[in-house]
Amino acid sequence: MNNAALDARLLAVASLVRRGARFADVGTDHAYLPLYLLDTGVIASAVAADIAEGPLASARANVLAAGRERDVTLVLANGLSGMDDLGLTDIAICGMGGELIVDILMAAPFVKNADIRLLLQPMSRAEVLRAYLASEGFAVTAERYAIAAGRAYLCLAVAYTGVPYEVDPVCAVLGDRALRSEGDNVAYAAYLDAREREALCRLRGKKSGGLATDAEDALLFAIKKEREVLA
């Protein structure tokens, strides 16, 4: 397997996996991520899990084709169910909405462990995910942004501290500048564009309904300021 099998979104996730990690990929689909990490020597073994037999069958076929059946354990599971005793250190949950990722984390209390790194790639509602992480004492330690198939994506590296904190509604959407890589500036600009379109759509809807638009106004102002920093 080579880099071509991973798009920029999954490469961003892969960049945050620690060398030698006991790794799990939740919602693995084709098992591309664990196979890439094995082939590049980042990890020695992996768990690849999915809730549906179809995607898991695709993963199994790819694992067999790569000759990695001894290195990848395939698991039919709902989220992280049954994985609390596997000694996992790095867990990727990718390609799902932020609310579903929250549900998976809530159902797996064992992830509240300072030795576990979570790699979370929400497809939507990142602000819901960030708010949950803050309320439960999970600190975001790094943010990566990538563009794949014309869409901008966010990936978060997260560690448990046990110390809850407040997250500003704007920061919940746009993230923390200090945690971003300068190499992601182009992708982050595209991410800002997408969030701006969403905010403008909500703003128009609220205005037509005679509702307050304070939240949208604040977000649009913050997006403008972020663009000035990127310029």
What is each stretch, according to the model?
Residues 45-50:
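Conserved SAM-binding motif I beta-strand of class I
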Residues 2-6, 82, 99-231:
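Class I S-adenosyl-L-methionine
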Residues 1-20, 35, 57-86:
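S-adenosyl-L-methionine
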Residues 52-54:
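Conserved SAM/SAH-binding beta-strand->alpha-helix loop
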Residues 20-29:
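Conserved class I S-adenosyl-L-methionine
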Residues 88-95:
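Short SAM/SAH-binding signature in class I
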Residues 30-43:
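Conserved SAM-binding loop of SAM-dependent methyltransferases across substrates and taxa
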